[in-house]
Amino acid sequence: MTIIDTNDTICAMATPAGGAIGIVRISGTNAIDIANSLFAPKNKLANARPSSLSYGRILDAQGQEIDDVLVSVFHAPHSYTGENSVEISCHGSRYIMTEILKALILSGCRQAEPGEFTKRAFLNGKMDLSQAEAVADLIASTNKATHTMAMSQLKGCFSEELKTLRAQLLKLNSLLELELDFSDHEELEFADRTELLDLVNRAVSKISSLVKSFETGVALKHGIPVAIVGKTNVGKSSLLNILLHEDKAIISDVHGTTRDTIEDSIDIDGVTFRFIDTAGIRQTTDTVEQIGITRTYNKISEASIVLWVVDQQPTEAEYSDMLQKCEGKKLIIVKNKCDIAPSFTLSHTDIPNAEISAKANIGIDALTALLIQVADIPQLTENSIIVNNIRHYEALTRALDHLSRVREAFDLGLSGDLISEDLKLVLIELGDITGGAISSQETLNNIFRHFCVGK
């Protein structure tokens, strides 16, 4: 792993330009000295108490005033990055913030790479790798669910779970390796096999639970995909528009108006639902409409929930066809046009359903409540552990595979050295998630390049 050059001081905008207030961030050994050289009154920052605010003026390299500013000074290791750090709060003008950056760079700073502040925080032990990734998730959070997941991971709930499990496995693996030093005494067993197998079983149960949470985590992070399907002119586009509170889809009495999928998202009770309006299902010779209907079936396969919009009792053949296409999905039947169409009772009463009028805005609240119920999202707290990162999911899946081989080795009565080899692979996978076993600079760069520059 590349070690930080402590003589290298970086700077970047920590907030977008154009707001009322902008923040320029500096971190590195010379951060305070460089900021002090551009600050008036002179030496005020050098003598400032740690974590204090100082009011003054920021100057360019020629001594010309750029702006009135408030400057925060943080001494290592008591800062976000663990290094000497300075944050300059100025007016949010792009010109002002750019001029401050120019002055800092001319005075010895380097423009930070994307995510470099958080990368330094990780390398300096201020947070582990999964917590660093949670910083990006927190910045990107758009609702209560994504915010809660990010805060839980940032607090270290996920990390502590893995570190505790890894420490237990490491202890027993060390005892297995100790047996190798006494291989001449085959009767010696330092690692209690019953205790080890019990721990492996508990690890399998815990990691399996985390792996299973990934589907929920991804849905919460990117939005639960909901396909709106049905025949032409049953009100699918009207339903999409009323759910989104805007005229997203064209509404017409002409059959086959919607020929392609239309997608948009909305938050319902702190959860993002990604609605997909699809082309109406019917027999047609129109080539373009046929393509749209094919895409409808594709969207059903991608959805977690399907809203089947009807305005009359479906036939048994239609039920059979829809149930087959929605196998493994959560299906809701939406009886539309309740204000004008004759009332009817569904023959399949076991399927969740709602009666609405998309045009007259009747029953929509009941439908959204049913969506939340059918989605069956777990109640999230600040301590909830939900996996939503593909890197974590893949590492956990590999760890689970290695643990399965450990159990097979027990069943076959294999020696401790063979069991130890697979246990080591489990330890590596768990360590990779928190960064304890990360050795590839390429891996770190791939993670942090997705951050904004000022973070």
Predicted regions and their residues:
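A glycine-rich (often HGG/GG-containing) alpha/beta subdomain
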Residues: 1-148, 152, 156, 332
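C-terminal-of-GTPase-core extension/linker across diverse P-loop GTPases
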Residues: 2-13, 144-267, 284, 315-455
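Short glycine-/polar-rich loops that comprise or flank the Walker A/P-loop
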Residues: 19-20, 51-53, 302-306, 328-331, ...
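Short glycine-/small-residue-rich Rossmann-like dinucleotide-binding loops
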Residues: 244, 279-280, 304, 311-312, ...
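Generic enzyme active-site microenvironment
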Residues: 275, 309, 334
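Inter-motif core of Ras-like GTPase G domains
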Residues: 289-313
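Conserved catalytic network of the ASCE P-loop NTPase/AAA+ motor domain
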Residues: 16-18, 64, 80, 220, ...
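Switch I (G2) and immediately adjacent beta-strands of P-loop GTPase domains
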Residues: 54-75, 256-284, 302-305
